[in-house]
């Protein structure tokens, strides 16, 4: 697998711009769904049952603590494909109530010297309803966390309504939530870390959760650059 990637797939993908290569990778994953035994082969290679890695956190039993963070499966369409690679959970999104295009292109840049990518997509996604339709159609075979955010066109004073809307639509179809208030690529989003905005968002989600029979953990995605004083 490594040899094939390094000497065949990587040169092909690197001949395209990063976003096109990203989309081609997902097209490849879709293709593998129709290849007999492809999923079984991937699970055999990457998915290992290791009892010592199992964790009980937030009332959820995780097969292992290594998950796929939000930002890759933006629309909640590849959670089972990603599970084949052995992830203990998959975070979908960020998802917003309405579809949005994200930032203008180009918005993804390779940094070969650091073997890294700079991501400035800006929460492009097809919207919560699209994700819900897919979750209804394809039952998750992995723990799914929904990363939710507000639409870029929504002013911060109305942000809590966006989070409420996304939360309510997704509640019955995912295992946990991540409230995204820290994407630096979206103008004004990090301002939601201010306690006045944040307390309104969290209070509304906690109140809304009380109406459901099943408990869903709510996690908060904050900026990694906040000081301990700011976090307090």
Give residue spans per PLM region:
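A gly/proline- and charged-residue-enriched helix-loop-helix capping module
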Residues: 93-143
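Conserved alpha/beta-domain cores
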Residues: 62, 70-72, 83, 122-232
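Active-site cofactor/substrate anionic-group-binding motifs, chiefly glycine-
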Residues: 59-63, 67, 71-73, 77-98
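An N-cap/entry alpha-helix motif that binds or orients negatively charged groups
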Residues: 5-55, 119-124
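Short, conserved acidic/polar surface loops in the N-terminal third of protein domains
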Residues: 78-82, 100-107, 156-159
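Short, Lys/Arg-enriched N-terminal segments with co-localized hydrophobic residues
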Residues: 1-3
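Non-cysteine beta-strand/loop elements that form the S-adenosyl-L-methionine
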Residues: 91-103, 171-182
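Short secondary-structure transition/capping segments
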Residues: 17, 101-106, 190-191
